[in-house]
Amino acid sequence: MRTTMTARARRVLVATAGSLLAIAMVGAVTASASTTTTTTRSSGSPIKLATKYASGLRMAMDATYPPDEFVQNGHIVGFDADLGMALGKVLGVKVTLVDATFDTIIPGIQDGKFDVGNSSFTDTKAREKVVDFIDYFKAGEGFYEQANSTKTFNGLKALCGHSVAVETGTTEQADAQSQAKLCKVNVLSYADQNQVNLAVSDGRADLGFADSQVAAYIVHLSDGQFKLTGTPFETAPYGFAVAKGSGLAAPLLAAVKAVMASGQYKKILDKWGVEQGAISDPTLNGATS
């Protein structure tokens, strides 16, 4: 989860039946890179948007985090990108997705450079002091294993007596190592997600441990090689960030509700294999910690 002001870029590579399927992720895209989609208002009651936004919304994201937002063939893609486009359609305005370094997005919203932050922001009480959040998704940490495994893992205590593969430098590595101080856990740390997946596929590790939506995406692209096990834990809401007093919070919340009601929300999450993080009741500033 992106709980700090530093983006945690990942290379997500999935091992499949003797070959590797790479999920494209370009980490060296300039902050000025953007993709623009012109939308028209969907049918139904119009959502009022301040006149100053009639020309469109600049939506900032750090496109280094598949499956949420990443660059593929020169365009920003991912479920966050798709949701942003869907919101533009409901609001009837042009949406420009702007690739920006993660820790510049909230300051950019505050100084008017960006209208919306859409970059897997965990909604926290600390962040709510400076921006408003429209919560639309939940994410945490999750496990995945070989599809033919008969074991079920729920929560950190389930790691006891098992080998778990993690990516070096992640929250999951820290959590697994903390659990290893309480019981016997063989923590296998690797430099990238590809090596983590290989450790699970060849049986060195009983399970892989990653952010819940990343784990879901790995399974989604594994061609039946992996499956999720247990339920996500340490979950927290993701939110679209807007400046306080911008007049965007209420219309964006209404737009999120409309996208959900239309079924488009479910279609987008299903497309990216992250339906496990779906919520049914979007809220304004719903942080719990």
Describe the predicted segments one by one:
Residues 63-66, 76-89, 121, 142-197, ...:
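Bilobed "Venus flytrap"/periplasmic-binding protein-like clamshell domains
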Residues 82-90, 147-149, 163, 170, ...:
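Extended ligand-binding regions for polar small-molecule ligands
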Residues 63, 138-145, 216, 220-257, ...:
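Periplasmic-binding protein-like
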Residues 42-48, 171-187, 228, 257-289:
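Ligand-binding clefts/hinges and TM-proximal coupling segments of bilobed small-molecule sensing domains
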Residues 94-158:
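Acidic, polar ligand-binding/catalytic clefts
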Residues 97-107, 151, 187-202, 236:
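Short helix-initiation/N-cap motifs at beta->coil->alpha
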Residues 41-120:
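Extracytoplasmic small-molecule ligand-binding "clamshell" domains
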Residues 103-104, 120-128, 177-178, 201-234:
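A ligand-binding cleft/hinge motif common to bilobed small-molecule-binding domains
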